[in-house]
Amino acid sequence: MPESGGNMANYAIMRCKKLTGMGSVASALQHCYRERETPNANAERTPENYCSVSKSTDQAMGRVRELLPEKRRKDAVLAVEYVMTASPEWWKEATPRQQAEFFARSEQWLEKKYGKDRVVAAVVHRDEATPHLSAFVVPLTQDGRLSAKEFIGGRSKMREDQSTYAESVKKLGLERGIEGSRATHQTVQHYYESINRGTRSQVSISPEALEPRVLRKGIFTKD
């Protein structure tokens, strides 16, 4: 099990972004599947990426259309994009088997939360500095309502998600961030940039950066 040197802990990291509009969903998926220019990715390593659900944007969008109810609000959240990773230091020590288990457990957490058929895309990115899982889910309730609020609305729900997610990967030597800490808002783009800076600059991720809230066009963060 990977362990950090000294008193430095390794953390489970989860962020999400709400997507409204089919164009926004398709654009995010194209980035995920490397079907558009991705400056932060190393093209030579892109073949190391792999997906476990849909194989392309077209397939994923087809699954989205199948799930979406015909009647929905114009401003409804159609999908939620997740980025799931761990402290950069953890990846340096984790074995290939441990890394594979991290991705499997992360996807299983999403399936348990939303339902397996609601996870329309799950792609492991190894062509960036810090490996991570990018996943897309349709926030459809069991009774057929489209409701992101029911799944990720409210701070108590978000804290619960952070705790249960960290618990799901705890056996891999990862911890949850400190509850009640404060962090600034980041856009998903900035978060991807911070992921990629992590390994190159060997920046440690503090627990204070892991306590979230949800913004419509951002990621889990806190005021």
Question: Which role does the model predict for each range below?
Answer:
Residues 1-223:
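N-terminal nicking endonuclease/strand-transfer module with a His-rich metal-binding environment
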